[in-house]
From Swiss-Prot:
Compartments (UniProt record): Golgi apparatus membrane
Organism: Mus musculus
Disulphide bridges: 157-195, 168-208, 184-353, 387-644, 700-775, 704-777, 711-764, 732-753, 788-791
Function: Glycosyltransferase that acts on alpha-linked mannose of N-glycans and O-mannosyl glycans. Catalyzes the transfer of N-acetylglucosamine (GlcNAc) to the beta 1-6 linkage of the mannose residue of GlcNAc-beta1,2-Man-alpha on both the alpha1,3- and alpha1,6-linked mannose arms in the core structure of N-glycan. Also acts on the GlcNAc-beta1,2-Man-alpha1-Ser/Thr moiety, forming a 2,6-branched structure in brain O-mannosyl glycan. Plays an active role in modulating integrin and laminin-dependent adhesion and migration of neuronal cells via its activity in the O-mannosyl glycan pathway.
Topological relation to the membrane, as annotated: Single-pass type II membrane protein
Gene from which this protein is expressed: Mgat5b
Single GO MF descriptor: manganese ion binding
N-terminal signal peptide: none
Domain of life: Eukaryota
TM segment ranges: 25-45
Protein's name according to its UniProt entry: Alpha-1,6-mannosylglycoprotein 6-beta-N-acetylglucosaminyltransferase B
Amino acid sequence: MITVNPDGKIMVRRCLVTLRPFRLFVLGIGFFTLCFLMTSLGGQFSARRLGDSPFTIRTEVPGSPESRGALRKMSDLLELMVKRMDMLARLENSSELHRTASVAHLAADRLTPGASLIERIQAIAQNVSDIAVKVDQILRHSLILHSKVSEGRRDQCEAPSDPKFPDCSGKVEWMRARWTSDPCYAFFGVDGTECSFLIYLSEVEWFCPPLPWRNQTAARTAPKSLPRVQAVFRSNLSHLLELMGSGKESLIFMKKRTRRFTAQWTKAAKYLAQKLGDIRRDQKQILVHIGFLTEESGDVFSPRVLKGGPLGEMVQWADILAALYVLGHSLRITVSLKELQSNLGVPPGRGNCPLTVPLPFDLIYTDYHGLQQMKQHMGLSFKKYRCRIRVIDTFGTEPAYNHEEYATLHGYRTNWGYWNLNPKQFMTMFPHTPDNSFMGFVSEELNETEKQLIKDGKASNMAVVYGKEASIWKLQGKEKFLAVLNKYMEIHGTVYYESQRPPEVPAFVKNHGLLPQPEFQQLLRKAKLFIGFGFPYEGPAPLEAIANGCIFLQSRFSPPHSSLNHEFFRGKPTSREVFSQHPYAENFIGKPHVWTVDYNNSDEFETAIKAIMNTQVDPYLPYEYTCAGMLERINAYIQHQDFCVGPSPLPPGASTAQSPFVLAPNATHLEWAQNISSVPGAWPPTHSLRAWLAAPGRACTDACLDHGLICEPSFFPFLNSQNSFLKLQVPCDSTEWEMHHLYPAFAQPGQECYLQKEPLLFSCAGASTKYQRLCPCRDFRKGQVALCQGCL
């Protein structure tokens, strides 16, 4: 039989008796809190506010004194409860000295729920504090609303019948049924009354006309724009490094890259400043939101930075940030959804309401992940401000995939399209899609002394394989061509591994493991050959190798890779066919720096290796991939691209008194007439336009390249008329306006001319043997394909 000290027994009984009413009281408080929350917020819980004391009621926001007083009393009572629990705990601890070990153990076990109870009380107190904040926000808006509503009469709050606002009555019906579906409506003052619906729909959104009895100064008006500040080139990048933040391996990599290129950015800024002279450049307010680095998107890149994962996106983003900053613009950089919401002015709720303030940014640079996040949280403001967005899009987005209605009707399926943006708002890593804007990145530019040192230090029989992940080395048939290469050259790899050599890498390959960027550069400076296995596509490494004096050898794809036959491209918003691992290197650089061969043909491969060993090349870097080239290009985009302006100059049915085109002397194409000035505000300038009728089955991209020119989609509206066909002496027995990404075009059977009905579908890409496409082309600057001769 166990004996129990009477004092200890009494102590335990007292604690248990004391705790029972506390439990009942806590249940009551919890039930009251839930009811209060549901009635005040339409059933929507507010997010927890981190960093505040769980017993702090924030009273700086004006609201209802009664509501705040009740919440304060609840919070004070909860605090008192916790203090009593603490006193009980101290009393119990002091009595332990007078108990036996067994009784102390029993009492401790019986009192354990007290600690859990304290935690529950603290959690309820935190929720009460959060509720107070939300209630204050709602009351702030609703009090203003009620004071204004009281000025009018009840019959003045009926949905008006105004033909200028055909959706008003339908929106009011929707608000009656769904206004509690998102707390953001209550945040803007909606309380379930007809007046609150109409005020919201006329002053926050724009579906209803302003109410005549409302004080119009109370409606939200855009603040007066401040005078523009002139952008000044920067040479010190230390503040940019602070703006970029830290904490992620991807950000650390980007900051290291920016530091390494600081001297080259500074030199490029001085060069461009002299080139532009006294041209005024307005400073833009720019938000850069790197969506793929947010936790909400998964941030799959950061964990792989140190394991040989792809770095192309981070290379490009680091260079974009540096270029924008060096050009003198004001930057905000976000890599989390919370930061994005704060900078945009997103109201609390589920993202159905517009922003609380006019968008404070002239431009927003983001990616597809960021684009999706903005659409989810900006409400109607996304449609209003999407013309300011620039989307960094590695592989490009063709117009047929961008136009939601057209893509859906014609089966252009994609995981990333349907945005209805101007296709030029998508910015690519390489200039493979003229429908988009070429953003690019930079590679290290060498001076003449460095180039000579590299040439003198080259090993004639050293090859480096392009591919840092072991999965790239799983290519079927690689043993065959690697055996041929091994006969002539020493093969080096930079494949990541933790402890054991990757089994995919043959024994005769000298694997250095994953190298830091400076050491990898040194390896390239010694090597003769940089060889690709067909993947990854269109990355920055081949350009870095060529810039360091290597010859790049890559595989020719037959048939070409595309979304129709290759898993990597499936779901991407493009039908582009890729004929090699790096089409830009093949088409814009070519031999002797770039060799493209059939790896399945051993004789062709071996012949190429022998020729490469006897070929001497200098380090080479296209101007458009230097710091100066990228600064020049981005500056031109910022100063001239404006996608918020009106529609195309020649809408359907329009005609001009005088055609701006003349037939070229050889009668092959159209040119802009010398006696007609360029269209004001048009960029590129219209005097650079050349129009050709492509052969059947030929895309405008290829038709322009055939003549040494670049397809320029912004010129399509000027050609989109029957006059253009007449000037080219093309007989049009009939002319039709339709929505099709291949128009304007001429169909030989029936002598039919087709004009484009939807400006967003003007497309350089796309071909059909049925049509001869009318193609707008332009010239371009040497080494800067994105800009025409007169584009600066």
